[in-house]
Amino acid sequence: MKHKIHFHIKKNDIVQLEITGMTAEGRGVGRCGEIAVFVPYTAIGDTIEAKILKVAKTYAFGKMISLIKPSQDRIEIDCKYFTKCGGCTYRHMTYQAELEVKEQRVRDVLNRIGGFSDLPMKPIVGAKHPDHYRNKAQLPIGIDDNQSMIMGFYSNRSHRIIDCESCALQPKSFTQAMDVFRKWADTSGNDVYKEETGKGRMRHLYLREAGATGEVMACVVVNGNGLYHEDTLVKQLREHVPGLKSVIINSNREKTNVILGKKCRTVWGSDTIKDTLCGLTFHISPLSFYQVNRTQAEKLYAIAKEYAGLTGEEILLDLYCGTGTIGLSMAHQAKRLIGVEVIEAAVENARKNSQINGIENAEFICGDAASAAEVLEKQGLRPNVIVIDPPRKGCDQSLIKTISRMSPDRVVYVSCDPATLARDLKWFTEEGYMPQEVTPVDMFPRTAHVETVVLLTNEFPK
């Protein structure tokens, strides 16, 4: 007869662990008897020594203090800020290993939560270049203990600024702009905003780059209307940032964590920069919603379009449409496109994007997806295809019931959280919509996030 071995671990204990799995947040999982110990910045196959930081009934959190035997997937860390700033989760392992972790996570969650053990899944769509893909940076500005200006990224789960000169996830132009701004700020006479008091002028440096055109926007978020010596900043940015097309001041006087205020003033250049996505043109302002990884977004949209199976005769309903990018990328293959989005500014962007691209068969409605869909269903709308791209919390069950009553032939579900996806797919099956195929997409390499595209078909067409 086998007896379970019970380990009584407590805070500050030192334990040896073999990492055998990963959590959704990217922490390695090792076991002490029945206790699962979660340790960040480890890889499957690592043997480590860990210090226990916190203990619950069935699990604990630890910190690696020594690497006894490295995993074959472990690589040398190439960023001095890794583990300090909250930007990356997986810089310590090969990109192939990261993709395998993400694909397995989708597979496991669909099985465990949804009960989909044999659902066909295509290999995860990885990035050709897993670094330098982010086309937007929001860099908080602060003061260190020596009263010197710092600028960079927040430490994981905190508002403590890690001073960074560059970021491996961002393009070279951002490093150039950061360097120029830092040197200018030191002698400009502009003071730094302090969250505690709401006093001070410089809040954030906000950068955007258009991947297709190389155009760069530099925006300074200020607690006020402007900055001293703006002309000098423009001159220096123009000299050192080759793709620069726009310098903007954004005014945010609110004592808030929201980065951008509503008022923008163009100091030099154009109000927007221009990019292309899936053959469409987009004009991007500081306030525009836009995909952070343009290249991977194009791959994801191509999969969604393939699953939609449009022939030119369909009514397409795009729920949680944001600025309309997914729906607009399919509009030429549809008879009619209706987009629904709850954020008014995003709806305005969507309408503008359709006008810029001469798309005349699209309309956009501002409203909650579940409520708007119910109204449209009662009005008699019967779309052939519905695309849904909900936030992390997934769909309301009431929306899924409304979709079922609309009786589309196909539903394309774009998910940013495998757990809520699995739950929602289960609800869809109860309404007669069966998932046919799943494709994970790595939209944000080196982070723990994974996107998933699913095709569902109507088993009981009316």
Would you name each region that the model predicts?
Residues 1-81, 363, 371:
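Terminal RNA-binding accessory module
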Residues 122-130, 195, 203-204, 440-443:
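Short, solvent-exposed loop/turn elements at beta->coil junctions and helix N-caps
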Residues 65-77, 83-192, 212, 227:
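Extended interfacial segments that mediate partner engagement and assembly in macromolecular machines
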Residues 2-16, 24, 229-462:
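Rossmann-like S-adenosyl-L-methionine
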Residues 28-33, 152-155, 219-221, 350:
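Short, acidic/hydrophobic/Gly-rich beta-strand patch recurrent on exposed beta strands
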Residues 30, 45, 88, 205, ...:
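Residue-level signal for inorganic ion chemistry
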Residues 207, 213-223, 281-285, 385:
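Short, aliphatic-rich beta-strand segments
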